[in-house]
A protein has these predicted regions:
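Long, low-complexity, intrinsically disordered segments
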Residues: 196-209
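Parallel beta-helix/beta-solenoid repeats that form elongated, surface-exposed shafts/blades used
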Residues: 1-194
């Protein structure tokens, strides 16, 4: 049977009242999208690709506020974001391009205040951030399981470090200008326990549609 091909720039589905309920078309940059509308014409769901090819799904409520987004970037990173009734994103979950997961919780003003991530080698890190979005405290485990707590100032500089060395020796250091000014155990070295590169960025990536 011969196939029939219909070509157009856009398609619209309407209800019995003539209201558009679904639209398939191209955005101004020729990116394809599919949008679903409620009886009042508000977009409740939209799926599409941006100019780079990244895919995104956005779901809105009856007030037109986006409440959930799901996206996949061209570098392989993905993200899920959940918003409140004011359209402010309050929780984000994402995977960096190399697969490191990150969970971020945000204040109602939109600033990220809590980040939990797992590095590529499996080390977990908990980050607490201030109203400017800067990390002020980090608690994590190194690859071999040694715990590390870092306290940072408003500029993001390390000031206090507490942890256990590989052999279980407790360590406490006061730091200024990245140099220890006082240490309770200066003969041992605390293992690194920083978030994986790009892990926090992944959770902040908004799906494009």
């Amino acid at each position: 049977m011969k196939r029939t091909v219909v070509k157009a720039r856009a398609f619209e589905l309407v209800d019995d009242e003539g209201n558009v309920r679904a639209r398939l078309g191209l955005a101004n940059d020729d990116s394809p999208f599919l949008s679903l509308h409620d009886p009042d014409g508000r977009v409740r769901a939209r799926f599409g690709l941006d100019a780079s090819g990244a895919a995104g799904l956005a779901i809105g409520d009856e007030e037109g506020k986006v409440r959930a987004t799901l996206g996949l970037a061209t570098d392989g990173s993905s993200s899920l974001a959940l918003g409140d009734k004011n359209g402010k994103i309050r929780a984000k979950f994402g995977l960096a391009a190399e697969g490191s997961p990150t969970l971020g919780l945000q204040h109602r003003d939109g600033e990220t205040r809590f980040v939990f991530s797992i590095a590529q080698q499996g080390s977990p890190t908990l980050s607490l951030q201030d109203e400017d979005g800067k990390a002020r405290a980090r608690l994590g485990l190194a690859a071999e399981g040694s715990p590390v707590l870092r306290l940072l100032n408003k500029e993001g500089e390390l000031r206090v470090l507490m942890g256990l060395a590989d052999d279980g020796t407790p360590v406490l250091q006061f730091v200024k200008d990245n140099e220890p000014t006082w240490s309770a155990s200066d003969a041992v070295e605390v293992p690194e326990s920083e978030p994986a590169e790009g892990s926090e960025a992944a959770v902040g990536t908004e799906p494009q549609s």
